Curated annotation (Swiss-Prot):
It comes from the Eukaryota. Belongs to the histone-like Alba family. The keyword Nucleus applies. Coiled coil: none annotated. May be a component of ribonuclease P or MRP. Gene3D superfamilies: Alba-like domain. InterPro entries: Alba-like_dom_sf, Alba-like_NAB, DNA/RNA-bd_Alba-like. This is Ribonuclease P protein subunit p25-like protein. GO terms for biological process: tRNA 5'-leader removal.
Amino acid sequence: MEHYRKAGSVELPAPSPMPQLPPDTLEMRVRAGSKIRNLLGLALERLEGGSARHVVFSGSGRAAGKAVSCAEIVKRRVPGLYQLTKLRFLQTEDSWVPTSPDTGLDPLTVRSHVPAVWVLLSRDPLDPNEYGYQPPGAPPDLGPTPASSCGPQPRRRARDTRF
């Protein structure tokens, strides 16, 4: 492949794993270069402002982890959200062209499968029988917390055994 350079990459169209979404759903398409701060700013503004009751974070390839991170941060900041997660593989098509045209090499097309994730966060209850369903957890401020998880513990001095 040292005699080729990448000319482009196209994600082949695939049906949405969540076709039954309400029309007012905010769809956040996370890319590898997306800034989490910008994504969260818009999603939290709409959820907390009441203009959106559903938010979908979707990402594929290297952005899949970033999409999950965004959804987890939103769940911490907005308690009581129901979650539905769908995983799939999407097909991408990469085009490669020869670096020098006089080598007699042909252009290449490479198809690959990349992981993709869709995370739906909703203020309204979702179908608990659907795969990937997660009910809202208890707000983090309620309930007793174990002493071991309350932050760093003071260091104990080692006992001097010289005497």
